[in-house]
C-alpha cells in the first residue's frame, strides 16, 4: 500500500510526464481548440466593450442632452416658462440648428454660445470658432486654417428689408444680398472636434459643424462689408435704431434660435416630461412647436446604438460553434487518453493509490490544458479581433479613441464553462474505468463481435475495394469518432459558406440596385460656374440622352419620428429610375420607410430648406444602398436649390469609357464616373467588411485543421494493431493510407454537405447583428459559394489526412501486435 501522499504524488507526476511525452500532440490539440474558441469569443466581447466605451465616453464628456425641442419660430418666453412650469427640467439651453448646402450631403451647423454645457463639442485641436468633424476634414481633404464655401437660406432677407435705404449703400456692380433667396459664406476652419450628433461619417450622411454666434456674426459682417459701404450703412443704422450695425445683427441672430436642449432631473421620466412640453406648446395662442423628442430618437444616436447593440450580440453567434466543437474535441481526446491508460489505472489501483487521487490526476490533465489554452485565448483575442473590426467602425463613425479592455466577465464565464466541461468529461470518462476491478483493467478490452457478417458473394462485396470495406467497417464501429468528425467539418463548412455568403449578400445588393432599381451608365457633376449645361452636353459626340437628377438633404417627418434623409427629384420619363414611370408619385426605400413606421398610402411631411410638403407614399421598394425618397421634380417648387447630377447615356456605337473621354475633353464637369467606376468604389467601401469575412474563413480553416488533426491522430492510434496486421500481410503504404483517408473523407464529406445547409442561416445571423445605416442586406448566396465552402472543408481535411498518414510508417509491426496477455 502507498502510505505517504508524497509517494502517491510522485507516482502520478511521473505518469503525467510519460503521458505528456507520448500524447503531446493530442494535448496540443486541446490547447489549440480551447485557444481558438476563447480567442474568438474574448476578442468579440472586447470589441463590443470597446465600442460601447467609446460611445459612452463621448456622451458623458459632451454632457448629452436628454430632450431636443425644435420650433419653427423663436419665442423668448419659452426658455423661461418651460423650466418654471415643468419641475423635471433641470437645465435648458437654446441654440440654432441650421442645415446648409455643401456638395451632395450638406452640413448641419449648430450655432451655440460657448457657455452652453449641454451637447457641447470636444475640442481635439485648434480653437473655437468653426469646428469641423475629423471625418469631414479627411473626406474633403481639408485641414485647420483652410476655407470652404456653403450656401444657405437667406435668413437676413426678411429681417433687414425693412431698412429700405440700405439699397442706397450698395457698392457698384455688387449683389444686394438682402434680396437674394440664398447667400454664400466662406467658412474658415478653426478647429477639429468630436460631437455626439456628428458621429456618422460625412461620406455617407450630412456632416456636423459647430460655430459660436460671434463667429456667425463675423461672417455676416464680412459679407456686408464686401457688398455695401459699411461705414455709411453703420451710420444709417445708428441714426434710425440708436445702435450699431453689429449690435443689430447680434439681436437678430438671437431671434433665429430654433432649438432647446433639456437635461432632465430624472431621465427615467422623460416620457412624462415630453408630454408636459407638448401640453405647454398646445396651450399657447401660437403653437410654434415643430418636434419634441428624446435623444434616443435622434438618427445619430439610433445608428450608433444599433452598432453597439449588434457588436454585443456578435460574440454569441458563430463563436458558440467553436465552443460546442471544443467541448466535443476535449471529450473525445480525454476519453481516448483514459481508455489507452486502462492498464495504468489498474496498476495505480493495484498498488493502493486512492481513487480520489486518480480522479484528480485525470481530471487535472484536461483542466490544466484547457485553462492554459483559454487564458492564452483571453489574451490574444483582444489583441487580434478589435483592430480588425475597428477598420469597419472607423469607416462608419467619428468617435474618440480609447484603450482596448482585455478581461471581461463574459470571457471569464466562457473560461469557467470550458473548465467545467473538461472536469465533467474527465470525471465521467475516468469513472467508467476506475470503477472496474484492477484485474479487469489489466486485460485488453474485449471487442464486441460484429453482428452482421457481409455475404462474400454479394455484388457489394465483390465490387468494393478492401480499403473502402475497411473504412466503412471502421466508421460503423467507431460511431463516436465519426460523429466528432462530422460535427467538426459541419462547423467548418457552415462557417466557410458564411464567409463567402456575407460578401455575396453585399455584392448582390449593389448589383441589384445598379441593375434593377437604377439605370446608370455615366454620372457627371458640373462645375460650380456652369449651372445649366444640359444643352451643351448634347453637343458632345456620342451623347444620346441627358437626365438631371437633383438631390436634397431633407427632414422627413412621420407621426412617430423624423430623420434626415436625401430626396431625389427626377425628370419625366426617367431613364435613371425607371420605376417612377410605372409608379408616378413618391417612391421610398423600405429601410427609410421602416425607420418612420410608414406603409404605402401613408402621408409623410418633407421639409427641404424652408419649403414644406405633405406627400402620400405610392411605392416602397427593396434596396441595398439606395436610401431616401424618389419623386418627380414637377411636384416640387422650382426655387429650392439642389445638387444636380447629370446622368448621361451614350449611343449604341460608343463605349462608356470612350464617352467618358469625350466628356472630360469638354471641361464642363468637376467629376465623371462610369458604371465600372461606381462598382469599384462600392467594392472599396466593402473592403473593410471583406476583412471580417476573411477572419471568419481563417477561423473556419483553423477549426477544421484542429478537428481533423486531433481525430486523425486518435484514429491512427486506435488502428495501430490493424495497421501492423496489414503491414504483416504485405499491404503497401499507399493501400493502408487510402483506408484511413477514405474513412476520414467519408465523414468529412457528410459533415461538409450538412454544413452547407447551415451556411445561409449562419450568414443571416451574422449579418443581422451587423446591420448598418449605409446599406440594407438583401440576403443571397451564390451556388458557387456553396461549392467553395465545401471545397475548403474537403480540401483542408484531405491535406491534413495525407500529412498525418506519414505516421503509418512509424508503426512497428512486432511491438504493435504484442498482447498484455
Predicted features along the sequence, with ranges:
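Membrane transport/envelope proteins' first extracytoplasmic loop
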Residues: 2-327, 336, 395, 509-522, ...
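Interfacial "coupling" helices/loops that link adjacent transmembrane helices in transporter permeases
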Residues: 23, 328-368, 704-747
